[in-house]
Amino acid sequence: MQLLTIGINHHTAPVALRERVAFPLEQIKPALVTFKNVFLGPHAPNAPEAAILSTCNRTELYCATDDRAAREGAIRWLSEYHRISVDELAPHVYALPQSEAVRHAFRVASGLDSMVLGETQILGQMKDAVRTATEAGALGTYLNQLFQRTFAVAKEVRGTTEIGAQSVSMAAAAVRLAQRIFETVSDQRVLFIGAGEMIELCATHFAAQSPRELVIANRTAERGQRLAERFNGRAMPLSDLPTRMHEFDIIVSCTASTLPIIGLGAVERAVKARRHRPIFMVDLAVPRDIEPEVGKLKDVFLYTVDDLGAIVREGNASRQAAVAQAETIIETRVQNFMQWLDTRSVVPVIRHMHTQADALRRAEVEKAQKLLARGDDPAAVLEALSQALTNKLIHGPTSALNRVNGADRDSLIDLMRGFYQHAPRSNDQSGH
């Protein structure tokens, strides 16, 4: 079995492409079934394994397969599933085999490959991806072991380095950008659209600035109300957004919608109602919640996750010593995992040896049982059984020794000596 990771992320693709390749949560299980059965082959010698990690910043397919054409098949499947041409998608895709796939998984879970260096959210997202793949019946020995090692490495990196210390989160970056637009956030009305983890983080950071008003708009009213109460804010129905957008100076959106929920026309009307007072908008969703054309309006300052990345990277630069330490830990653990993977490569051979030996055993036992049933001497039957098993079991090694020459033969002789040096001795040889 070969490990392979196929994906795109914020390093290789803009948000405009990432949002088209993202998987809504409810689509991941059926997508995994299709991916396994159609492109990795349901009747392969070993059942293929797969997991999908889809976040704001990355979409990745983790695979374990015997199919040597899995790389091309996975890229083709990804493009066909999302109705994007291979020519458009392929330049942005990375394909990481074996140790590169292992190293990548370790780095992602440890926060080294995140836009926010050392952030912890990705670890939870990866665990969710593993849980979903397990429920879909898509995981097996190889990916299970990879992800369990991945989580252990992430824990080690975060526990022994300062990789997450003083990190500038996306939420903190949003506040910093708002402070560049407005003299003070405390005079502004802030609207958050959504009620997930990212909105909760953003609300925490903005609430610390004591804004004039803090409002949560969410599709599920009860959840929005609970979050608003935590920050002494108010909740409003998401359906009120088109008629009330003009009330807010700062709008931060991050929902799981597959289509934009804020269009150009609605924002144009809001700007007009505000008499062209500026609106600061942050779209942290992938796919995007706000139509990108909104950013072209004169009095609107629209930022996406990619725009916030520059501010985040400023904070990342100061923690390079921790990065180096983390990379050292990861490299050691990659080598450990590859050693385990190497041992797995002999499992099919060992299984075949057991199957062959057991077939020989059953055949000879059946023959012996017939002789005993016929009334033959039990001692003679046992002797014949043992002789037959001995001859058949050493036939393969003996033939191999006779076929090879030179250095190969010397190596094989040494190997055979090692096989049989601990063979048990008979009673007459043991001196008892």
From Swiss-Prot:
GO terms for biological process: protoporphyrinogen IX biosynthetic process from glutamate. It is an enzyme of class 1 (oxidoreductase). Its EC number is 1.2.1.70. The active site is at C56. The record marks H104 as: Important for activity. It comes from the Bacteria. Keywords: NADP, Oxidoreductase, Porphyrin biosynthesis. It catalyses: (S)-4-amino-5-oxopentanoate + tRNA(Glu) + NADP(+) = L-glutamyl-tRNA(Glu) + NADPH + H(+). InterPro entries: 4pyrrol_synth_GluRdtase (IPR000343), 4pyrrol_synth_GluRdtase_dimer (IPR015896), 4pyrrol_synth_GluRdtase_N (IPR015895), GluRdtase_CS (IPR018214), GluRdtase_dimer_dom_sf (IPR036453), GluRdtase_N_sf (IPR036343), NAD(P)-bd_dom_sf (IPR036291), Shikm_DH/Glu-tRNA_Rdtase (IPR006151). One of its GO terms (molecular function) is NADP binding. It holds the Pfam family GlutR_N. NADP(+) binds at G194, A195, G196, E197, M198, I199. Catalyzes the NADPH-dependent reduction of glutamyl-tRNA(Glu) to glutamate 1-semialdehyde (GSA). Homodimer. During catalysis, the active site Cys acts as a nucleophile attacking the alpha-carbonyl group of tRNA-bound glutamate with the formation of a thioester intermediate between enzyme and glutamate, and the concomitant release of tRNA(Glu). The thioester intermediate is finally reduced by direct hydride transfer from NADPH, to form the product GSA. Possesses an unusual extended V-shaped dimeric structure with each monomer consisting of three distinct domains arranged along a curved 'spinal' alpha-helix. The N-terminal catalytic domain specifically recognizes the glutamate moiety of the substrate. The second domain is the NADPH-binding domain, and the third C-terminal domain is responsible for dimerization. Belongs to the glutamyl-tRNA reductase family. This is Glutamyl-tRNA reductase. The lineage of its organism: Bacteria, Pseudomonadati, Pseudomonadota, Betaproteobacteria, Burkholderiales. The gene is hemA.
